[in-house]
């Protein structure tokens, strides 16, 4: 068979109950919305025999997953993985109708519990319907860093290892205080978590309402459950390099396998730093077109 993309939808409960009150009957409430996902299968995939390795690639705030397209399927890393026998999955992490009802930019799932639930649902859908290995790799870029990290920390699916490019890891410093996209992620945070507003109509940050979805403050992250590696440029003006460095440093201090590949320049695109590799390991073409794989030559 040739490389193919299977597009699907999964129902996601978007109601966020009060975790601090286990007797609250509202924990039984449901707000079910359909979220979009896709699974890209390699040419080597078969319905029987050896299961294919799945990689969950969490998209950034510059893109989405829709009924007929996604940011991730056009990325070099996805095409390289699929060309070399891996399956790649992603979901939008923010149901389209839910976002429309609350006026949230569809690109900003901000790694919320809704996003985590969607990834978990999509994982089980793919495992149940395709011949895939149950343990997965998780990758993400930018906002996909926080959605991927919160998925890993949920412990809800078996993860082999976690990687990310310039990951968002701190909801306060990187979304609330330094919001990109003209504040769209900050607005999404206010709507999704139900943050209160001050007398000027500005959202008031409240860590207690985030359901543990701020990796920088999540104690589970200090003893990271799987090996993790991040890539980031020191001069990244969208996501704080210092936050990433501290996050990785804390894990290493506690004996975890954590690595940060740092580059002195490159801004918010560490995957584009360096020269094109002429003869990369493995298959380097996707559907007849060469994949642009870079090799960074500078580090700090």
Language-model-derived ranges and their functions:
Residues 237-238, 245-300:
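C-terminal catalytic histidine-bearing segment of alpha/beta-hydrolase fold enzymes
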Residues 149-202:
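Hydrolase active-site cap/lid region
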Residues 181-245:
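The feature captures the conserved acid-bearing segment of alpha/beta-hydrolase catalytic domains
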Residues 130-142:
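Alpha/beta-hydrolase fold nucleophile elbow
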Residues 1-49:
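N-terminal cap/lid segment of alpha/beta-hydrolase-fold proteins
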Residues 108-130:
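Alpha/beta-hydrolase active-site loop
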């Amino acid at each position: 068979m040739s490389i193919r993309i299977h597009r699907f939808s999964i129902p996601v409960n978007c109601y966020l109950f009060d975790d601090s009150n286990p007797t609250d009957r509202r924990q039984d409430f449901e707000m079910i919305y359909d979220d979009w996902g896709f699974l890209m299968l390699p040419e080597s995939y078969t319905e029987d025999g050896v299961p294919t390795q799945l990689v969950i690639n969490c998209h950034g705030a510059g893109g989405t997953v829709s009924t007929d397209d996604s940011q991730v399927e056009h990325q070099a890393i996805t095409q390289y993985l699929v060309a070399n026998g891996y399956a790649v999955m992603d979901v939008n992490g923010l149901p389209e109708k839910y976002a429309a009802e609350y006026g949230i930019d569809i690109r900003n799932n901000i790694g919320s519990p809704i996003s985590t639930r969607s990834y978990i649902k999509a994982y089980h859908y793919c495992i149940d319907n395709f011949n895939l290995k149950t343990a997965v790799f998780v990758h993400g870029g930018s906002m996909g860093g926080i959605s991927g990290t919160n998925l890993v920390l949920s412990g809800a699916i078996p993860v082999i290892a976690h990687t990310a490019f310039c990951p968002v890891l701190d909801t306060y410093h990187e979304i609330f205080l330094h919001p990109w996209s003209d504040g769209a992620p900050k607005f999404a945070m206010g709507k999704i978590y139900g943050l209160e507003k001050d007398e000027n109509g500005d959202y008031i940050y409240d860590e207690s309402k985030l359901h543990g979805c701020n990796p920088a403050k999540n104690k589970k992250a200090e003893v990271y459950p799987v090996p993790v590696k991040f890539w980031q440029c020191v001069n990244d003006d969208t996501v704080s390099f210092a936050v990433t460095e501290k996050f990785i440093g804390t894990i290493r201090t506690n004996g975890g396998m954590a690595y940060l590949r740092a580059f002195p320049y490159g801004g918010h695109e560490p995957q584009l730093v360096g020269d094109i590799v002429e003869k990369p390991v493995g298959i380097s073409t996707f559907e007849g077109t060469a994949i642009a794989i870079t090799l960074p030559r500078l580090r700090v």
